[in-house]
Amino acid sequence: MKNLTPLSLVVVLALVIMSSSCEKQASSEASTTEVVTEKTSTYSETKNAYFGDLHIHTSWSFDAFIYNVRTTPDDAYNYVKGLAIDHVSGKPIQLGRPLDFMAVTDHAEYMGVMMQMIDPDSRLATSEMAKRITSPERDTSRRAFGEIGFSISRNEPFPELLQKDIMKDVWQEIIDAADRHYEPGKFTTFAGYEWTSSPGVRTANPPFARNMHRNVIYRHTDRVSEIPFSSFDSQDPEDLWKWMDHERSKGIDLFAIPHNQNMSDGLMYDLKGMVSGKALDNTYATSRLRNEPIHEVSQIKGTSMTHPVLSPNDEFADFEIYPFTFVASGLPPASQPDGSYVRQALKRGLAMQDDLGANPFKFGFIGSSDGHNSAGPVEEDNYFGKLGNIDMLPEFRIAEENVVLNRVRMSAGGLAGVWANENTRDAIFDGLQNRETFATSGPRIQVRFFGGWGIDKDLLSAPDWLTKSYSQAVPMGTDMKPGKGAPSFIIWAVKDAESANLDRIQVIKLWKGADGKSQERVFDVTWSGDRQVQNGKLPSVGNTVDIASASYTNTIGSVKLSTVWTDPTFDPSQDAAYYLRVLEIPTPRWSTHDAHTLDIAPPSDPPKIIQERAWSSPIWYNSK
């Protein structure tokens, strides 16, 4: 993101579980991490922006291990803190700048089992499966890997690999790693894991699996579940929520973050139960609302905000679309857009909240990486792939013949942004749970968004505008109650200091019409330069990208954009939701950087340039 100037069966099987019996008791092993009870030196009443990654896999995830990843949770934390770590390519990888918070989220299914099978001190090393995994016969080991992968999507686990005491020890090691790297006021870590539900459609040709994955994040490390609830316990998210409610009743604070909605084939935001197929009711709505306050909307396997089919009048809807399901062989079938994207879900929530008595699709936004190298490759000019040796080199990633995994279609990943008083577990967790969050496609763009009534249009020029914003309006992620006239919104964004300038800020408005149907509209509200709206459209900001050198210049765009905007179409009788989209000027995509490295022309698809972006969480207006 720096400002630059002048396969095989194994491949197929990892797709099934890529992401992307449990006793319900608190862990008996208490963390030694000290509870922070005093404010840190970075404490701010008007809150600071913190950037993090809540979706990272290590060798303790099956689908990382099979591609030769051998790095650990400690490596993952070191990488995010700015240190170099080993990469399967043989070259070290290093993040350009440290992040502020992170969680290792290895798959709950067979968590750490693969590493145990190659550990001579583990009893799993003598298992029949371990002998096959470590067999010098390549076909034997591949078949073994395949059987393990299929057992996850089919929900038919190998009993010999589900030994509770081993799983408990591995889980405790993940918790301990989080504690080792927690530095209150400087760097925050969370215990977490991925629940990897991928219900399949076996009758299809070819059979495929649909993504229902969630990452589960814990507030504390001394109050966590004994072992994770996995998709082997249930593939139904509603059962996950019931389990989470039970854990919460024991003083364990946690929430789940859905991701890769784009690969759910319409299940993630279905109008009926995702697995049960039952009609939605108030219990469903309140349970989902309680357990899933934020959704991951941008990551390596694509952006789940919206799709051109669903938003045909949005010129920026076609951004990093990865429209596939998981497949057993060949080219993955397309994931149907209907029910698979966030904007449509927000609209559906507005339409159904009166009937259900609650809005099940009321959530904030974050991004994350889903990197499987103990690292997220979120920088376009520092991209090293997602999944071990399958995409470890540029020539592997952008080969024209690439079909399985569609590696060239993968994004560089996203980041989670949160506004919090300080960089501690409690403060960051509160910010996430309260939905005062924003997502980015990788750059560290900061976004502020407040909504209220009777806001002075000159408020942003006041030195204490932030204090006034919090006192006179509500921040992103919350509700506006009815007021006089039309609502006004305080809108502010500043560029990433090491990335591209800003093109524009847009307000995306969603509302429930008089006919009960939900609608959408995109407003350009502030932009760089002296462009004028022509025939209802703002002209392009321009383009400084040089494809041959994979470079651009910041000679266009703005460092900061801000405004107070009043909705000119407001109808007080209509429920509505508003969120921001902040666009950078065009920059080279990672695949263009790879092509430059190889001294070849970039692939014809996907686009050679992109406009990186950030999205605020919504603000809702309820007419009643």
Residue ranges and their predicted role:
Residues R154, D222-S225:
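Active-site gating/metal-coordination segments in enzymes
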Residues D222, F232-E238, E320:
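Conserved, charged catalytic cores of large soluble enzymes
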Residues P136, P207, P228, V275-G277:
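Ser/Thr/Asn(+Pro)-rich, low-complexity disordered segments
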Residues E23-P73, Y77, A84-T126, A130-R132, ...:
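C-terminal functional module detector
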Residues M1-L9:
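Bacterial N-terminal signal peptides that target proteins for export
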Residues T126-P157:
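Aromatic- and acidic-residue-enriched carbohydrate-binding clefts of CAZyme catalytic domains
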Residues I217-R219:
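Long, charge-dense tracts
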Residues M18-S21:
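C-terminal motif of bacterial Sec signal peptides marking the signal peptidase cleavage site
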